[in-house]
């Protein structure tokens, strides 16, 4: 079994507005191993996106903890969490969130700039990642000049440019047609094999989830089962 990279211990999340309490996550516990490809499957409103926000240190659980590489996130300062997100975690969303006035190369380079890497390293690494996703020939094109599938590939290159140990992906193919969605998941698998990056993908699509090595089901804020989707039609 691979070394545990990320572990959730009894995560709960409650929102309160006035006297109204809404429990979104209930005692969620699971782990992700080094280099693992894992999916969490659930319908809209099941708590998947809230869970990813907690895993990435973008929000704080009401109770429970997230442990990344043996270090509890509850003990990290805001600055330390930001550094963790920049250096060790990658994020992919349903919408690409590319900066419209920047080229593909400049968008991919942004995490390196934030991480204060050397200028020569920034350009070469960003171009290397664009080549890895098959878009080095589109390096100087802005998002408006790219197709939907190309924009999502640029977003994936940006997520991986700092060579993170884990990528958190929230419905990464939700805005794509079937052909482009298939292409994106093939790309994630290839990057996993080449770089050893672990991926945790949340999705409602069983056909896409079955591409991952392990699948968990989430309903109403609870992990209810480990699924067996290999060969599912």
UniProtKB/Swiss-Prot annotation:
It is a peripheral membrane protein. Its main location: membrane. Residues 6-233 form the ABC transporter domain. GO terms for molecular function: ATP binding; ATP hydrolysis activity; lipoprotein releasing activity; transmembrane transporter activity. Signal peptide: none annotated. It comes from the Bacteria. GO terms for biological process: lipoprotein localization to outer membrane; protein localization to outer membrane; transmembrane transport. Belongs to the ABC transporter superfamily. Lipoprotein translocase (TC 3.A.1.125) family. NCBIfam families: LolD_lipo_ex (TIGR02211), PRK11629.1 (NF008639). Part of the ABC transporter complex LolCDE involved in the translocation of mature outer membrane-directed lipoproteins, from the inner membrane to the periplasmic chaperone, LolA. Responsible for the formation of the LolA-lipoprotein complex in an ATP-dependent manner. Such a release is dependent of the sorting-signal (absence of an Asp at position 2 of the mature lipoprotein) and of LolA. This is Lipoprotein-releasing system ATP-binding protein LolD. The gene is lolD.
